[in-house]
């Protein structure tokens, strides 16, 4: 038995290494901690996002099960297509064969097929909204190809995954945009079997419905950028191809006036539509959760329309000089900022929208067609939003007033209101309008002018940038209140593309000296730590405010404590059962019905103002301002630190591209490695409070690292590590440019790179002094120190090819991406960028 246990442990360890190796998690350098940390990051990344265990191999039976589960009608129509397939074949052959059928519905379904396994839903199983499941085997013990997750978690892990198997990236884009709604949002959950959303549960205080925002823009954009890098030109053919669709989530965002009146309660649930969707799912499959046309088929549109729908939903909530209004009942990346929902305005989303719009500008500027057909309803929304920007361009000459800010928001918001009302009531009529690509370019340019103006307006006096602001709608317009600094804002602005390398350096300099930096972990807090008001110092009404209100004075004199109470020391407090200003307003209505009608009519607004001045609820951000772990006060959230790491690396790379001076480049490199040195794998267990090479969620101010493994941190670090090693893809060509690789990573003695080839077989490659090894798309890559840069490709058939320089051409690069085993190893002679 003991030997059986030992054998099983060895087999399990081998299989685990194979899983990590399939996603390029095996590296050998002199920096053992970095290599081990990368192994852990890759492991946890695939545990969240899943893994293509058999790479591009498609199992015919599983594909049929998938297509039939989505649309039984379409499967039956295309039965001959599936009958003609081999039992197992390459994914690229599936996409090519589906394209040749000229059947858009079949193409769409095949593009959405992702044979992932080893994925589990992210989230604490104790949370009632996480129906937790780990499914890796079928009932008969065979491998189950399945994935499921909250969309904002699973898509970020797919970004890092796709770097090791990049020919799936367009399918990931398809999965993403086909899960977005006509009004521009994504439902909560996504699985292999389709999308899912939360429903109202009146008896469950934890249940709620709504949409997240900032993730959507930046996660989709990262896939688009990857596609452009790895497969230049591929997305352009999708821009005019009707291969995409809209999710039909039965959420109904209320009208603009209702949003202004109560921005906390903005979404109704359409029970009737939900029932109809259920009937459609029963009839055809998961496609029943998509918007249908007037012929009871899935309504399909091109990628241009889908990309526009996403950004128009953001710009319709744009408040000049403030950001994107958070009015869909959900926070953003930081769940702990939950109280910002309603009156919060996100500069974080605007920073990412800036990068997104710049990408669209470049994309539309490069297309070969002059016009593209878009749904009539969306064109009307596009024209309304564009004309709002054009008509108000003169406002960019100076600071925008509250009045003009309110007028602009009103035009943008009402345009979206009109669009949504039509879609909710009648769906799409099915008519298209030809839109000139020149007009799309102009729209991107004009919107970018307003975005850049707002970014400049949100540079703080200390040189940092605002992350979130607060809006107050009044009869005179929209007022802005600025909140305290947050790490999230600095990361987003560094990633926005708006700053020059020199400006990015200035932000990093100030950040290191700010209250966001904590020396105890040589890292960064989400927000400055602070002392909270003690309980005995809360709910104290200044005597001068009581004297301002005849109603409050009358109640004190009458001994009526339903609104205000006085204590034995002569102090005043609001009723202790109140939880917000609405509680106070409700109490005043009761008083009006009981003899205080005149005084309530006179002082209702004043008392509400006093209440808000006492509690300042508007500036309460949520759990982030009232707890001490997770994303709370004094807490380091390692995912945001890794986002900062990657943003600093992007700033360094931009400096290279723009030929920034040596001093700037040196200081940017210093910042990168300073941020890197604060991450756990560079620390002792005593300092980190956990195994240093393992990723952890957060470190509270009073303890060591908490919540191991299942953190979004791993995604950014996987990406950053590959860039540290210098692997880049430019116009479809693999390039080795180790601009930030340190010479100390090269081996001081001999070693062995153990890896797994595309067939899953364990292989080894000897390494000598002055070398290092890793895999890329499961092809072993060996770096050797040399003065002249060159590449030696070894092929599976025994051939070899020498390349002068640091770039592999696009055809050979595609052979690497496609994992067909053509290239068996890559030897690169080079000099690292740093000593």
Residue ranges and their predicted role:
Residues 1-835:
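Acidic, mature catalytic/reactive cores of soluble proteins
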């Amino acid at each position: 038995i003991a030997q059986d246990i030992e054998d099983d442990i060895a087999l399990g360890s081998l299989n685990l290494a194979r899983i990590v190796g399939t996603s390029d998690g095996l590296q050998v350098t002199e920096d053992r901690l970095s290599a081990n940390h990368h192994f852990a990051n890759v492991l946890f990344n695939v545990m969240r996002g899943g893994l293509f265990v058999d790479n591009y191999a498609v199992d015919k039976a599983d594909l049929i099960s998938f297509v039939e589960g989505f649309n039984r009608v379409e499967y039956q129509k295309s039965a001959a297509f599936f009958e003609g397939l081999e039992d197992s074949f390459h994914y690229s052959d599936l996409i090519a064969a589906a394209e040749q059928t000229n059947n858009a519905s079949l193409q769409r379904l095949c593009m959405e097929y992702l044979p992932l396994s080893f994925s589990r839903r992210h989230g604490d199983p104790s949370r009632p909204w996480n129906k937790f499941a780990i499914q890796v085997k079928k009932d008969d013990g065979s491998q189950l190809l399945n994935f499921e997750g909250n969309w904002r978690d699973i898509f970020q892990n797919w970004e890092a995954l796709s770097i090791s198997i990049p020919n799936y990236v367009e399918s990931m884009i398809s999965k993403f945009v086909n899960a977005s709604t006509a009004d521009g949002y994504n439902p909560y959950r996504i699985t292999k079997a389709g999308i899912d959303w939360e429903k109202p549960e009146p008896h469950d205080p934890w249940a709620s419905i709504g949409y997240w925002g900032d993730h959507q823009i930046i996660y989709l954009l990262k896939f688009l950028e990857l596609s452009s890098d790895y497969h230049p030109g591929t997305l352009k053919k999708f821009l005019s191809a009707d291969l995409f669709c809209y999710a039909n989530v039965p959420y109904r965002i209320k009208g603009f006036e209702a949003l202004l009146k109560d921005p906390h309660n903005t979404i109704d649930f359409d029970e009737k539509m939900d029932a109809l969707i259920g009937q459609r799912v029963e009839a055809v499959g998961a496609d029943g959760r998509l918007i249908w046309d007037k012929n009871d088929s899935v309504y399909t549109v091109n990628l241009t329309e889908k990309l526009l729908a996403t950004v128009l939903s953001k710009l319709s909530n744009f408040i000049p000089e403030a950001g994107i209004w958070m009015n869909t009942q959900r926070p953003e990346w930081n769940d702990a900022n939950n109280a910002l929902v309603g009156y919060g305005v996100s500069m974080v989303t605007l920073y990412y929208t800036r990068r997104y719009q710049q990408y669209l500008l470049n994309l539309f500027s490069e297309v070969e067609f002059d016009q593209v057909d878009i749904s009539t309803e969306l064109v009307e929304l596009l024209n309304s939003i564009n004309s709002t920007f054009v008509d108000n361009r003169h406002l960019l000459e100076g600071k925008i007033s509250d009045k003009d800010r309110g007028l602009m928001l009103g035009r943008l918001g009402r345009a979206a209101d009109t669009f949504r009302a039509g879609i909710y009531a009648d769906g799409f009529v099915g008519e298209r309008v030809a839109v000139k690509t020149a007009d799309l370019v102009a729209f991107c340019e004009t919107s970018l002018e307003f975005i850049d103006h707002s970014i400049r307006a949100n540079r703080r006096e200390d040189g940092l940038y605002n992350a979130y602001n607060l809006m107050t709608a009044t009869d005179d317009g929209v007022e802005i209140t600025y909140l305290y600094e947050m790490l999230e804002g600095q990361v987003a602005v560094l990633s926005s593309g708006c700053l020059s390398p020199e400006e990015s350096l200035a932000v990093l300099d100030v950040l290191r000296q700010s209250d966001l930096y904590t020396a105890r972990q040589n890292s960064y807090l989400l927000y400055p730590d602070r002392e909270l008001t003690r309980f005995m110092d809360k709910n104290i009404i200044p005597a001068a405010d009581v004297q301002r209100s005849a109603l409050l004075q009358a109640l004190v004199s009458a001994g009526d404590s339903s609104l205000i109470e006085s204590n034995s020391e002569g102090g005043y407090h609001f009723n202790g059962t109140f939880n917000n200003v609405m509680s106070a307003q409700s109490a005043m209505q009761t008083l009006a019905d009981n003899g205080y009608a005149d005084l309530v009519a006179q002082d209702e607004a004043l008392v509400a103002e006093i209440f808000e001045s006492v509690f300042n609820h508007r500036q309460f951000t949520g759990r982030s301002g009232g707890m001490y772990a997770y994303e709370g006060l004094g807490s380091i959230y390692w995912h945001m630190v890794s986002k900062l790491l990657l943003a600093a690396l992007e700033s360094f790379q931009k400096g290279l591209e723009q030929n920034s001076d040596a001093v700037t480049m040196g200081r940017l490199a210093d910042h990168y490695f300073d941020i890197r040195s604060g991450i756990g794998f560079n620390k002792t267990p005593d300092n980190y409070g956990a195994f240093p090479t393992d990723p952890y969620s957060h470190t509270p101010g009073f303890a060591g690292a908490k919540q191991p493994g299942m953190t979004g941190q791993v995604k950014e670090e996987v990406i950053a590590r590959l860039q540290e090693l210098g692997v880049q893809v430019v116009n479809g060509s693999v390039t080795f440019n180790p601009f930030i690789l340190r010479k100390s990573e090269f081996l001081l003695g001999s070693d062995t790179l153990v890896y797994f080839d595309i067939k899953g077989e364990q292989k080894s490659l000897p390494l000598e002094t002055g070398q290092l090894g890793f895999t890329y798309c499961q092809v072993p890559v060996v770096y050797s120190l040399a003065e002249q840069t060159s590449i030696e490709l070894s092929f599976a058939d025994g051939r070899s090819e020498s390349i002068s320089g640091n770039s592999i051409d696009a055809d050979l690069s595609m052979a690497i991406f496609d994992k067909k085993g053509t290239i068996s190893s890559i030897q690169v002679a080079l000099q690292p960028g740093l000593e």
